[in-house]
Amino acid sequence: MTEKSDSTTHFGFETVPEHEKAGRVQGVFNSVASKYDIMNDVMSVGIHRIWKDAMMDWLAPRPGQRLLDVAGGTGDISFRFLKRAGHGHSTVLDLTTPMLEEGRKRAEAEQMAECLDWVTGDAMALPFKDNTFDVYTISFGIRNVTRPQEALNEAYRVLKPGGRLMVLEFSQLPNDGLQKLYDLYSFNVIPRMGQMIAGDYDSYQYLVESIRNFPDQETFLGMVKSAGFENAKHRNLSMGIAALHSGWKI
């Protein structure tokens, strides 16, 4: 117990006690919930939509599959999954209830409420039985988890044999010059956009810092394999600004 309370982790570029991170992340997303989808479009100039389509292309949802969409927030991945599958079911889990409320509103507007469950919960301690889901997705969320390896271990636990993990996350550009240009944009433009559109500079400063702190593609691939996933692979998107990681529970 003492060891856990003494452990630290990153909150952006700040080092904080592990037990504080979840609450601080929750505060960030409570603050940005109502503007989250708009800000995604503005920050990425709409490219996040292309990345999510690429995620669905690789995932190839099938009718009747059961999805667990972790850190699913407003349900963007779940809506895409269900439309591609034709019919199925998605459980959206997120630490932040206001994000889920935004998703519920959208589900009702799109007449998809019966296909979706909304659960407030922690990626490191999923409230589901072993071998429950066909697919586990986490999109732009795992970098906000206090201990990402534990989240991956939980993903493995709740997937059925033959189930698939798919992670979409910001990553690292392979070229130092391009990375410096991207950092220049990220640190100087995105927080200011957050202030202008969402009235929140600090939350978007954290989001930018959390992107920069996240492991590179090969390091994260090793974490996926360590959780037990087989045939683990990654694909770069937009030269490595983001990356997809896939693995199977065999």
UniProtKB/Swiss-Prot annotation:
InterPro entries assigned: SAM-dependent_MTases_sf (IPR029063), UbiE/COQ5_MeTrFase (IPR004033), UbiE/COQ5_MeTrFase_CS (IPR023576)
UniProt entry keywords in alphabetical sequence: Menaquinone biosynthesis, Methyltransferase, S-adenosyl-L-methionine, Transferase, Ubiquinone biosynthesis
A Pfam family recorded for this sequence: Ubie_methyltran
Domain of life of the native organism: Bacteria
Catalysed reactions listed for this entry: a 2-demethylmenaquinol + S-adenosyl-L-methionine = a menaquinol + S-adenosyl-L-homocysteine + H(+); a 2-methoxy-6-(all-trans-polyprenyl)benzene-1,4-diol + S-adenosyl-L-methionine = a 5-methoxy-2-methyl-3-(all-trans-polyprenyl)benzene-1,4-diol + S-adenosyl-L-homocysteine + H(+)
Gene Ontology MF term list: 2-methoxy-6-polyprenyl-1,4-benzoquinol methyltransferase activity; demethylmenaquinone methyltransferase activity
Positions with a binding annotation for S-adenosyl-L-methionine: 74, 94, 122-123, 139
EC supergroup of this enzyme: transferase
Biological process, per Gene Ontology: aerobic respiration; menaquinone biosynthetic process; methylation
Pathway: Quinol/quinone metabolism; menaquinone biosynthesis; menaquinol from 1,4-dihydroxy-2-naphthoate: step 2/2; Cofactor biosynthesis; ubiquinone biosynthesis
Enzyme nomenclature, EC number: 2.1.1.163, 2.1.1.201
Stretches assigned to coiled coil: none
PANTHER family the record matches: 2-METHOXY-6-POLYPRENYL-1,4-BENZOQUINOL METHYLASE, MITOCHONDRIAL (PTHR43591:SF24), METHYLTRANSFERASE (PTHR43591)
Family (UniProt): Belongs to the class I-like SAM-binding methyltransferase superfamily. MenG/UbiE family.
Protein function: Methyltransferase required for the conversion of demethylmenaquinol (DMKH2) to menaquinol (MKH2) and the conversion of 2-polyprenyl-6-methoxy-1,4-benzoquinol (DDMQH2) to 2-polyprenyl-3-methyl-6-methoxy-1,4-benzoquinol (DMQH2).
Stated name of the protein: Ubiquinone/menaquinone biosynthesis C-methyltransferase UbiE
